[in-house]
Amino acid sequence: MRVKGSDVSDGATVRLLEIYERLLAHHGDRRWWPADTAEEVIIGAILVQNVAWKNVERAIAQLRARGWLTLAALHEAPTEDIEESIVSTLYYRMKARKLKTFAAMVEAEFGGDVNLLLALSAAELRARLLAVWGIGPETADDIVLYAAHQPSFVVDSYTRRIFFRLGVTREQATYDELRDFFMRHLPSDVGLYNQYHALIDALGHSLCLSRRPRCGECPLQSLCPSYARPLLPSGVSHCGAGSPS
């Protein structure tokens, strides 16, 4: 989506929207999240923790083949069989427990109806998700945004790397500080948050790499103080960065 008619008087807002428009022009519509149902989004959000999406796709295919792409099915399925189906996602034993725990919560508190959970307000839903074992801030925000279709900006390692190199945020900023920064300076729009997060991940995966970033191909090079400046061996930029405010 393109942002029209937004209040862009704030300097940080202007910069964030310019970054967004450049990423959109370069990468196009990402059409993310690739799932058919809200439950599939939730399952994928848990499985993708600390692993590449291609690994999750294999696990999703295995779960689909067994008819286990619903929380009700996972609630009834043997843990060992779930583990066998999701082995491609790494940490598969822990992730099987996380899936079972989440499914049990929906069954116990919402009568097995995930739509009742997702109907909570964004703030209530996020708080309830964070109270579930195995659900951290990024996974919670994935579920709020992509399953419940409510505004909650998702932050990941790509977000941290890219916006530190751009001089927009501090390297040591916490997850909540980064999330609050984006939500304070961007219009509260589900489509915008959805697309922006997907575009950030596209850039981080293809060009703004942790080591040897491909700066010469980056659509943000003219905005980036790290462009054409050497990186430390760790891949961290030499440039300074401002605080999220």
Where are these regions (language model features)?
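Acidic, metal-coordinating catalytic segment for phosphate/diphosphate chemistry
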Residues: 245
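Catalytic cores of DNA base-excision repair glycosylases
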Residues: 4, 11-238
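Phosphate- and other anionic-substrate recognition elements at nucleic-acid/protein interfaces
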Residues: 1
